[in-house]
């Protein structure tokens, strides 16, 4: 009887351990997948503010260029390319989270007009798939299919990103019309300077939080510094913590002012935003334009033929 109870207890403990492990795994996977694509998804319902500013600029403080190329006009229910270019010097290295140097990553957000969305895989041509590579796009929100995000991905491979876009059809979507629409894009290269919670990353400059004399500098075992600033007027000491990454600019015994830079600025990346316009073209309007041009050409041909016929008649009358 006791042996039976022991086996029953062991069985329950095994089941409980498996259940706990499975829950931890699911939670960890969920948090990683939710946090990975772009920090802005966690804190902003819409990536573009009412002022037109894209919220990525709140964390990526340096201003850098970005370029977008789209067709001038597209027909309804058509797949086209939106090419986003995020240029930077491929030779530079950025400060990683552990303080070491590494290659830059890139990311982009593409804000399309309502109705435009990511093209389904079966509508993408082999040539376009080759340009896209192994990139995986996703919607900014499940209910915002017109806003697409990508990254962070390797800047060495994907400084030029091709988005496959499907245009809407006003015949099936009554909220869409044949008009000219704006497209907005934001692109960053490198890590940000501020995290979404407002704290600094190690990819930015650190300033003195007090004025005084640098009385002590302690280099931490895992990198970074503890800088003690002493104020002789009130015998107060302030300790500033510098994470691994930025290079120190001050030394012991040096007098410093409030907000004076203690480190260099290691940031080599930045964020930029741009826009473009695209026309959703009515195919009947295109057909009408072609018909009009054909009519003009035919009229010109008939006019030339008529003129030559008139000249022949005049010439025959003169000979007569």
Curated annotation (Swiss-Prot):
Secretion signal span: 1-35
Location(s), subcellular: Plastid, Chloroplast thylakoid membrane
Parts of the chain that traverse the membrane: 286-306
Cofactor(s) required, per the database record: heme
Main location, first listed in the record: plastid
Membrane topology type: Single-pass membrane protein
GO biological process: photosynthesis
GO terms, molecular function: electron transfer activity; heme binding; iron ion binding
Pfam family, one: Apocytochr_F_C
HAMAP family, A to Z: Cytb6_f_cytF (MF_00610)
Protein name: Cytochrome f
């Amino acid at each position: 009887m006791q042996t039976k109870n022991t086996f029953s207890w062991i069985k329950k403990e095994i089941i409980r351990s498996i259940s706990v492990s499975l829950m931890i795994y699911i939670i960890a996977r969920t948090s990683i997948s939710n946090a990975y694509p772009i920090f802005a998804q966690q804190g902003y319902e819409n990536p573009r503010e009412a002022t037109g500013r894209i919220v990525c600029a709140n964390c990526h403080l340096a201003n850098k260029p970005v370029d977008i190329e789209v067709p001038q006009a597209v027909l309804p229910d058509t797949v086209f390319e939106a090419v986003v270019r995020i240029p930077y010097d491929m030779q530079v290295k950025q400060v990683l989270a552990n303080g070491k140097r590494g290659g830059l990553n890139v990311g982009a957000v593409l804000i399309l007009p309502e109705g435009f969305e990511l093209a389904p895989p079966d509508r993408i041509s082999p040539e376009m798939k080759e340009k896209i590579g192994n990139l995986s796009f996703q919607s900014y929100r499940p209910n915002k299919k017109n806003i697409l995000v990508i990254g962070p991905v390797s800047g060495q491979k994907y400084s030029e990103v091709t988005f496959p876009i499907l245009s809407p059809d006003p015949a099936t979507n009554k909220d869409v019309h044949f008009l000219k629409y704006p497209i907005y894009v934001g692109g960053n290269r490198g890590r940000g300077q501020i995290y979404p919670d407002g704290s600094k990353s190690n990819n930015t400059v650190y300033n003195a939080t007090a004025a005084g004399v640098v009385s002590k500098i302690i280099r931490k075992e895992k990198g970074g510094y503890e800088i003690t600033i002493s104020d002789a007027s009130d015998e107060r000491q302030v300790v500033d913590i510098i994470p691994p990454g930025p290079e120190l600019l001050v030394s012991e015994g040096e007098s410093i002012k409030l907000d004076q830079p203690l480190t260099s600025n290691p940031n080599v990346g930045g964020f930029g935003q741009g826009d473009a316009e695209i026309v959703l073209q009515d195919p009947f309007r295109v057909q009408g334009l072609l018909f009009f041009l054909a009519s003009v050409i035919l009229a010109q041909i008939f006019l030339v033929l008529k003129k030559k016929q008139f000249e022949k008649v005049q010439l025959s009358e003169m000979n007569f």
